[in-house]
């Protein structure tokens, strides 16, 4: 949505905009161009079901949310998209506190995991599954690594601002999360898988 004319054609006016539960309707003439996450090089995708890891390729998909998560401010600006008559439309914007987010439990865990090394190391299963690619032979390499080796493969994780995409409806009660971290400029990414166990959320797999 980098072009104003295109963006205007893909907003369902009057647009529902909620701020901490209070709703207003924004008319077409009052709409201001929104860059969304166009200026962000890194974004993430969250999956809460192992069967949905290819959801971005699902042509039957009709619902997507994009969350602009400000961890320091403790806020979320959520853009809601729905497919209507074959076209993706922005149908709502919902600004709310991070503490009231649908996936607040996992997000609170992720914030600590991404910023606290000791906490991070205590939430990695030992051993953990690992998958990578040999770009010389184009072969997949899979195995297991000792938790002590995590430091050699730990990806850079968004901390202050996280732009997160979710395909389909959220399943906050699911005990599975996969978090894909994607760099637009590098054209590369990695995926971390977590499962909720007796100790809380634990990293169980890394695909790099």
What does each of the following model-derived ranges do?
Residues 2, 11, 38, 115-118:
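Generic surface-pattern signal
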Residues 2-3, 27, 116, 146:
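Helix N-terminus capping/helix-initiation residues
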Residues 72-100, 187-208:
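Short beta-strand edge/turn micro-motifs at domain boundaries
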Residues 1-24:
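Acidic/polar, low-complexity intrinsically disordered N-terminal segments immediately downstream
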Residues 84-122, 129-141:
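Surface-exposed beta-loop interaction hotspot
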Residues 4-7, 88-89, 121-122, 201-203:
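Short loop/beta submotifs within extracellular cysteine-rich repeat domains
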Residues 17-74, 134, 138-188:
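Surface-exposed, charged secondary-structure patches
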Residues 7-12, 120-128:
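Surface-exposed patches in mature extracellular/periplasmic domains of secreted proteins
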